[in-house]
Curated annotation (Swiss-Prot):
Compartment annotation: Secreted
Biased composition (Low complexity): 96-112
UniProt family annotation: Belongs to the TGF-beta family.
PROSITE patterns: TGF_BETA_1, TGF_BETA_2
Assembly description: Interacts with SOSTDC1. Interacts (when glycosylated) with type I receptor ACVR1; the interaction may induce HAMP expression. Interacts with type II receptor ACVR2B. Interacts with Hemojuvelin/HJV. Interacts with ERFE; the interaction inhibits BMP-induced transcription of HAMP. Interacts with BMPR1A/ALK3. Forms heterodimers with BMP2 in vitro; the heterodimer then binds to its receptor BMPR1A /ALK3 and may induce HAMP expression.
Gene3D superfamilies membership: 2.60.120.970, Cystine-knot cytokines (2.10.90.10)
Name of the gene this protein is made from: Bmp6
Protein name: Bone morphogenetic protein 6
Principal cellular location given in the protein's record: secreted
Amino acid composition bias (Polar residues), ranges on this chain: 386-397
Ranges annotated as biased composition (Acidic residues): 140-153
GO molecular function: BMP receptor binding; cytokine activity; growth factor activity; protein heterodimerization activity
Xref: InterPro entries: Cystine-knot_cytokine, TGF-b_C, TGF-b_propeptide, TGF-beta-rel, TGFb_CS
Glycosylation sites: 234, 262, 379, 397, 447
Length: 506
């Protein structure tokens, strides 16, 4: 440093080392969840909190553990729910049940006969399909060199994969005038997003939501009522500002081995316009599929227009009806064509899935509200920073011994927060945070902006008026969270700016 002799520089270095030898502070002082859009670190490890503590003279990373107090945990849960855009903690009626003690064979047989609910720890068809979507997103992120969370593989317990139907023979494929039916099961199961159209739906959507069928019992077949199989879905819990970009109804088809084993079926899905007591309902044809009796897997029907109508005018939501006609023009019971209803296995239940994208007006309103909260937080933190602004040039001698600005590990555990009953995946994610000194000279690895370099020079000349540059995120990535809502519908939502990927001086 100009004006200081060799001995004086050595004394300054020694004094800086002496002042930095105290016990390292707990960092961050309060666990806050992931880095938000304004660069503010939100982060949490639940209970316990895990934050990286870089030792003063060691490059190895360790973790500090501290049990959260009740009010701290409650406040942290509230803040993370706010980041996730949820007004309260969902409490689904049929969420993720924890595995229980083994049951007797007689009890197990009676439970399998009822088939109303899956065994504890197992998922129904809609959550399994959404889990496939989640893992598909995670796989794409890994291929791009980005790990946004912990993947969760679906259990292979005899379920039919949400992958497209098995073809009976190479020559039969040409008879299907729509998308191919579903692919092989769990052994070599492919993602359900096998078409470019489905991939585009997922890439363009901010949120994917599945809906369970609300019809408790399948109606008995009646020759007078051709469209007898009905399905109803509750779309009242869609968040404000979300618009439907695509929607599909999915029903599982088993292989037919009875009297119709050599038949070809025309399966039609209708929107119910008006219900009548003594005659068939007024219906509007939405989509059709032609399938072979020997095919099995998930069938998809496009109901995008109907879903948009139901969202805008909920009173028009009277459900869907399905009919099956043979090539001879005979209307048959869908069960005879292999279609699975409410009385079928829990992992083959029919469901609806919709893709949503948030409107720009709602995004601007949300951002303005959240920015005001962050500004209040910054104002409180700035008051404490002003006290320590009066630094001198000798600070840079001592700061050279501190860790330079870089990314540190910070893991947010949803399981530690007690949310394992409604968050399906991930169990947690690496939020990370930025910390360290932005000391002069700013090296290339500090990712300093030109403004930060100029601010550093001005700080050297006027340390009492101009603060040092701050270590802040320069690259933020999104995560995907799969969870239940209060109605046991499954939601897959992307959250932007949740993971710190790189840090720099600003």
């Amino acid at each position: 440093m100009p004006g200081l002799g060799r001995r004086a520089q050595w004394l300054c270095w020694w004094w800086g080392l002496l002042c930095s030898c105290g016990p390292p502070p707990l960092r961050p002082p309060l666990p806050v969840a992931a880095a938000a859009a304004g660069g503010q670190l939100l982060g949490a490890g639940g209970s316990p909190v895990r934050a990286e503590q870089p030792p003063p003279q060691s490059s190895s990373s360790g973790f500090l553990y501290r049990r959260l107090k009740t009010h701290e945990k409650r406040e942290m849960q509230k803040e993370i729910l706010s980041v996730l855009g949820l007004p309260h903690r969902p409490r689904p009626l049929h969420g993720l049940q924890q595995p229980q003690s083994p049951v007797l064979p007689q009890q197990q047989q009676s439970q399998q006969t009822a088939r109303e609910e899956p065994p504890p720890g197992r998922l129904k068809s809609a959550p399994l399909f959404m889990l496939d979507l989640y893992n598909s997103l995670s796989k794409d992120d890994e291929e791009d060199g980005v790990s946004e969370g912990e993947g969760l593989e679906p259990e292979s317990h005899g379920r039919a994969s949400s992958s497209q139907l098995k073809q009976p023979s190479p020559g039969a494929a040409h008879s299907l005038n729509r998308k191919s039916l579903l692919a092989p099961g769990p052994g070599g199961s492919a993602s359900p997003l096998t078409s470019a159209q489905d991939s585009a739906f997922l890439n363009d959507a901010d949120m994917v939501m599945s809906f369970v069928n609300l019809v408790e019992y399948d109606k008995e077949f009646s020759p007078r009522q051709r469209h007898h199989k009905e399905f109803k879905f509750n779309l009242s819990q869609i968040p404000e500002g979300e618009a439907v970009t695509a929607a599909e109804f999915r029903v599982y088809k088993d292989c037919v081995v009875g009297s119709f084993k050599n038949q070809t079926f025309l399966i039609s899905i209708y929107q119910v316009l008006q219900e009548h007591q003594h005659r068939d309902s007024d219906l509007f044809l939405l989509d059709t599929r032609v399938v072979w009796a020997s095919e099995e897997g998930w069938l998809e029907f496009d109901i995008t227009a109907t879903s948009n109508l139901w969202v805008v005018t909920p009173q028009h939501n009277m459900g869907l009806q399905l009919s099956v006609v043979t090539r001879d023009g005979l209307h048959i019971n869908p069960r005879a064509a292999g279609l699975v209803g409410r009385d079928g296995p829990y992992d083959k239940q029919p469901f609806m899935v919709a893709f949503f994208k948030v409107s720009e007006v709602h995004v601007r309103t949300t951002r303005s509200a959240s920015s005001r909260r962050r500004q209040q937080s910054r104002n409180r933190s700035t008051q404490s920073q002003d006290v320590s602004r009066g630094s001198s040039a000798s600070d840079y001698n001592s700061s050279e011994l501190k860790t330079a600005c870089k990314k540190h590990e910070l893991y947010v555990s949803f399981q530690d927060l007690g949310w394992q009953d409604w968050i399906i995946a991930p169990k947690g994610y690496a939020a990370n945070y930025c910390d360290g000194e932005c000391s002069f000279p700013l090296n290339a690895h500090m990712n300093a902006t030109n403004h930060a370099i100029v601010q550093t020079l001005v700080h050297l000349m006027n340390p009492e008026y101009v603060p040092k540059p701050c270590c802040a995120p320069t690259k933020l990535n999104a995560i995907s969270v799969l969870y239940f809502d209060d109605n046991s519908n499954v939601i897959l939502k992307k959250y932007r700016n949740m993971v710190v990927r790189a840090c720099g001086c600003h």
